[in-house]
Amino acid sequence: MRKMGGGKQMKLGILCTMINGFGRRGYYNSQEIGLGRALARKGHEVMIYKGIDPSEKEEKVQVEKNLTIWYLPMKHLGAHGFMDCKYLDPQLKALFCFGDQQIFLPHVYRWCRRRRIPFVAYVGTAHSLDSNFKSKVMNALFAAGTLRIYKKNPVLAKTSAAKEELRQLGVPHAVIAPVGLDTAVLKKNIPADEKMRLRKEHGFEADDVILCNVSRLSWEKRPLELIDLFLQVKGKKKFKLIIVGNGPLEEELNEKIRKNGLEKEVKIYPNVPYEKMWEIYEMSDYYLNMNKGEIFGMAIMEAVYYKTSVAAIRALGPSVTLKDMKGHKLCENDDE
């Protein structure tokens, strides 16, 4: 192996078995691709194994030199994907795993252990955000399997809160390694007049006060409560609301918008390719985050990057991201 920056070039793997909105191809600033880019630019050869629903098409994409992402259909139980280890390269020098509370990781760990490949977990949360019976069962399965692996191996925590959560679960050696934005895919050098041009293109007026939200339309993201909040401020100024996302509450959200006659004030974009996401932030005045259990909040970081003021419910992620930042606000409740 040739020398790269004082170290050796290595073949590294990144595994993400989450079958949900995490790392959705082409639509979000992907954490696994951001990590992959950082490693590849150190001279390492990186393969990302990203689990997808079996209904989707398998695809291998060369992101850039030394970085490939392999979208692999996986059997899954909810958001928990099952990685078939036959796809893993036995020549890997290490496998980074976006683990969280994924329950189907023990067999991957055993595969690595047999080949003496270091298994490094990357954790944002170690408990289910749901409180129903199914989630309690999943938490129990996690504790019986994956958590035991975390207790014996290197673990990276995305936030100080994640590190503390892991410590309380008996994982004493987690090291904080914050998630960052993949700057390679962020828009740079935006002209000063672009905001007004984009507003016109998207059907908004120059004097509109545009609020935006980017999230999966699921209960924990609280899109229905976002409409309640919008109704409170509607009419005080020329407020408009942009919501980017889809999910199980999409139909109910659309019905609530119709019921309250907000079709002209609220615009929903179910899917926005990531190369176009900068337009949403650029033409908006404020970004609203309603999730009371936000673990990290990539969209919050993106909004800050594009100089869009953020108002977020105080939670683990926003409390770190927005700490001591002027022009942004952490709120204790919706009324603020």
Predicted feature locations:
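Nucleotide-sugar donor phosphate/pyrophosphate-binding loop at the beta->alpha transition
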Residues: H127-K151, A162
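A short, active-site helix/loop in glycosyltransferases that binds the activated sugar's phosphate group
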Residues: K151-I176, L181-K188
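Conserved acidic donor-binding segment of nucleotide-sugar-dependent glycosyltransferases
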Residues: D324-D335
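Nucleotide-activated donor-binding/catalytic signature segment of Leloir-type glycosyltransferases, i.e.
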Residues: N254-V272
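Short hydrophobic beta-strand element within catalytic cores of glycosyltransferases
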Residues: S309-A312
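Conserved donor-binding/catalytic core segment of Leloir-type glycosyltransferases
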Residues: G13, L156, R199, E205-K221, ...
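Aromatic "clamp/platform" in nucleotide-sugar-dependent glycosyltransferases that forms part
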Residues: K292
